[in-house]
Amino acid sequence: MTDTTTPVILSAVRTPIGRYLGGLAPLPAPRLGAVVIREAVRRAGVEPTAVDEVIMGNVLQGGVGQAPARQAAIHAGLPGTIPALTINKVCGSGLKAVMLAAQAIRAGDEQCIVAGGMESMSNAPHYVYGMRAGIKAGNSQLVDGMIHDGLWDSFSNTHMGNLAEYTARKSGVSREDQDRFAAASHQKAVAALEACRFKAETVPVEVAGKKGVTVVDKDEGPRKDSSLEALAALQPSFEKGGSVTAGNAPGLNDGASALVVTSLAFARAHGLTPLARITAYATGGGEPKDLFFAPIVAVRNLLAKAGSAIGDYDLIEANEAFAVQALADGRALGWDWDRVNVNGGAIALGHPIGASGARVLTTLLYALQDRKKTRGLATLCLGGGNAVALSVETM
């Protein structure tokens, strides 16, 4: 690749992650997206007019309105001449947006792109099917759009949590292992919050309410009181006698994250120093019911493309869709657990599904910077049986 076709990341930022119906709930996804787009462009040091395109992931689009990414771009103050694309690759949406940006730069089509993801699970609507034709008699039923469009496997007609139980049986991951992993996720996230290690990667969000404007400036999910004993006391959430609980799964969340991706030539021409170079990316998949094993395939595909081994990466950020998923994938790939999710993961921080891919990458970039490391790998599984992976090298 030449400098013109080498993709680099100039900036990365995320909102704090809000709890379900928490501090960020009054803001729809495009408004959350606008916050991070505006801040990512500011941090990158580029003029808004220099942006060629905005690409944002968003999964729960019901009721959001036309062109969510376009809404976010306009609300961020970008000129109306800049096109925008909304993508839905379920939990991989935010990272796939960055991959699409890198592809556009490698193809020579564009030089400066804002990419990321946004989600407000709190604002997902309920649906009433059949109302358009009219319900002539009998009862109608409300369908939870958040679950139907975000957390429900359409192939097996079952909740993601049931497939997590299937994953636990297939991989042999025990309840105790899941709870221990979840407790560690909270402990690491709480330690990171107390040490202000998330401060650099987050932008405070102003939320207008009846009592005036409040500012959300910290992640709402990490719990100091999380412990192995407390988690062990929770009942299974999806199957009687199962091992997956509300404690070893992520929450329902709101948040957004965005990155400015440019060519190396663009960065140099504007006197800007990139955070990192995008070195490789890949997707992978299997049967829909095996979605939680899909990162194994995606990461192996990336390693083959990059000619690297898993041990070559100083830090790994793997989305914690469930503790069982993270454990099954890590064991199969031979991760050094001391390098994985060093500041906690989605079980503690939260999983705003369309935003998580960009959030994971953003957290990885700042963790590499904070620990003075060089090479990083980000990966997520996603509903339908696929996964995404992307690697970076700091500059």
What are the language-model segments listed below?
Residues T49-G57, P83-N88, I113-M118, D177-A184, ...:
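Beta-strand segments within the central parallel beta-sheet cores of soluble alpha/beta enzyme folds
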Residues M1-L27, L228-F293, V297, T362-T363, ...:
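Condensing-enzyme catalytic core mediating Claisen C-C bond formation in acyl metabolism
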Residues N58-C112, F155-H159, D225-G251, A332-R359, ...:
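Conserved catalytic cysteine-centered active-site region
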Residues C112-Y166:
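Flexible glycine-/small-residue-enriched beta->alpha junction loops
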Residues R14-T15, P26-L27, L32-V35, R43, ...:
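N-terminal extracellular/periplasmic Venus flytrap/periplasmic-binding protein-like
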Residues K89-E119, N162, A168-R197, A258-A265, ...:
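Active-site-proximal alpha-helical scaffold in enzymes
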Residues L163-E165, E201-V203, G209, T279-A348:
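Active-site pocket-lining segment
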Residues T2-V59, G63-V64, P68-A72, A76, ...:
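Conserved active-site "lid/cap" helical segment
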